[in-house]
Amino acid sequence: AGMVVSIVSHGHGALVQRLLHQLAGASAASITRVVVTHNVPEPELQVPAGGWPFALEIVCNAAPRGFGANHNHALRGAVEPFVCVLNPDVELLAAQEPFAALVRTASEPGVGCAYPLQLDAVGRVQDCERETPSPLALWRRRVLRRHEREVDWVNAACLVLPLPAWQAVRGFDESYFMYCEDVDLCLRLRLGGLRLQRAPARVVHAGQRASGRHWRHLIWHVRSLLRLWCSDVYRRARRLPAAPRGGGRLD
C-alpha cells in the first residue's frame, strides 16, 4: 500500500536529513512519496548517491505557516491510500520498522488514525495518549501528575490516516496555530464514527514542549485552548463515550 509522508522543518535540516535516511533504509516498502516543507529558509537537503527510494518533494514557504496549514498544503491532492504526518524529531528504532504495522492498523475497519507508542531517548514511554483537555484534566495531569485513563486524542508526532478519513475531516483546522490542531483533528475523527488505534509499533520522540520554555509559545497554546473550548467540536466531543487506553500488542 502506498503512503505519502509530510514532514515540516523549522530549521531542522539535520534532523530531517537523518529521518529521510532512516525512512529510506527501513520503510521504503511502505512509502511512495515524501513532502518536506521548509517553513523557514535553510540549506538544501543532501541527496544520497543512489537517490531516494521514494519521490521527494520540497516545498519552500515564502512566509511561515502554522502546523496545520503546512501539512494540509503538503497533503492536498494526495492520491496515495494513506497519509502520514511526521515530526522531524522522530527517530526510527534500529530493526523496528514502524510503518508496515501502522498501515495495517490504519487499514482495519473503523480506524480513522493509527499511531505508534512513543518512547524518549532512554526508552521511557511518552504520554502521547491524552484525555480531552479541560481545566480539570490539565490540573490533574500537570499539577497532580496523574496518568490519564482515556484516549480522546493523540499528539501528531506520527500519525497514519487512511486517505478517505483524512479527506472526510478535510485535514487540520487551520484556525489553530501551532497548538491543539491534533486535538481537534482527533475529536473530529471520533465524531465521524472513527477510532484512534495504537499500532504494534514504536518510535522515539523527544516530546519537547516549547510552551513551557517560551512566552510566545505559551500565548499561542493558551489561545488555541480557548479556541478549542469555545468550539462546537469540543462541545459535541464531550458527549462521546470514553475511549479506553491501549492498542496493538508490542511483543
Residue ranges of each PLM-predicted region?
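Short, well-formed alpha-helical segments that are part of the catalytic scaffolds
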Residues: 12-27
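Short beta-strand/loop segment that forms part of the nucleotide-sugar
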Residues: 31-41, 57-61
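Short aromatic/hydrophobic "clamp" motif used to bind/position activated sugar donors
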Residues: 83, 89
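Conserved donor NDP-sugar-binding/catalytic core segment of glycosyltransferases
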Residues: 94-126
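A short, conserved alpha-helix in the catalytic core of glycosyltransferases
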Residues: 153-170, 174-202
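Active-site-adjacent helix/loop segment of glycosyltransferases
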Residues: 184-251
